[in-house]
From Swiss-Prot:
The lineage of its organism: Bacteria, Pseudomonadati, Thermodesulfobacteriota, Desulfuromonadia, Desulfuromonadales. Coiled coil: none annotated. HAMAP family: GatC (MF_00122). GO terms for biological process: glutaminyl-tRNAGln biosynthesis via transamidation; regulation of translational fidelity; translation. Heterotrimer of A, B and C subunits. Allows the formation of correctly charged Asn-tRNA(Asn) or Gln-tRNA(Gln) through the transamidation of misacylated Asp-tRNA(Asn) or Glu-tRNA(Gln) in organisms which lack either or both of asparaginyl-tRNA or glutaminyl-tRNA synthetases. The reaction takes place in the presence of glutamine and ATP through an activated phospho-Asp-tRNA(Asn) or phospho-Glu-tRNA(Gln). This is Aspartyl/glutamyl-tRNA(Asn/Gln) amidotransferase subunit C. NCBIfam families: gatC (TIGR00135). The keyword Cell wall biogenesis/degradation does not apply. It comes from Syntrophotalea carbinolica (strain DSM 2380 / NBRC 103641 / GraBd1) (Pelobacter carbinolicus). It is an enzyme of class 6 (ligase). Belongs to the GatC family. It catalyses: L-glutamyl-tRNA(Gln) + L-glutamine + ATP + H2O = L-glutaminyl-tRNA(Gln) + L-glutamate + ADP + phosphate + H(+); L-aspartyl-tRNA(Asn) + L-glutamine + ATP + H2O = L-asparaginyl-tRNA(Asn) + L-glutamate + ADP + phosphate + 2 H(+).
Length: 95
């Protein structure tokens, strides 16, 4: 599959990117090369390969979730610029 300039312009519009002529030309070449590599992968014989989620075995490396002591509400709110009903008051960011 060959990537053309119109497809790169379309992707740029979807991503809301303003690209210069040089950037469009460069990205067209780059994206075309990337798809060429993907097409090369399609040539591999994977009939005897078991599908996996990870290339290597993965183990959960997280620690056990244990509740510990905390500093308490009063101390946490002590340096807050503003608090109400034991909660931090922050500026509204969503209408």
């Amino acid at each position: 599959m060959k990537i053309n300039r119109e497809q790169v312009e379309h992707v740029a519009r979807l991503a809301r990117l303003a690209l210069s002529e040089d950037e469009l030309a460069s990205l067209t070449d780059d994206m075309d090369a990337i798809l060429g590599y993907v097409e090369k992968l399609n040539e591999l014989d994977t009939d005897h390969i078991i599908p996996t989620a990870h290339a290597v075995p993965v183990e959960n490396a997280f620690r056990e979730d244990c509740a510990g002591s905390s500093i308490g509400t009063d101390k946490a709110l002590q340096n807050a610029p503003e608090a109400s009903d034991n909660c931090f008051v922050v500026p509204k960011v969503i209408e």
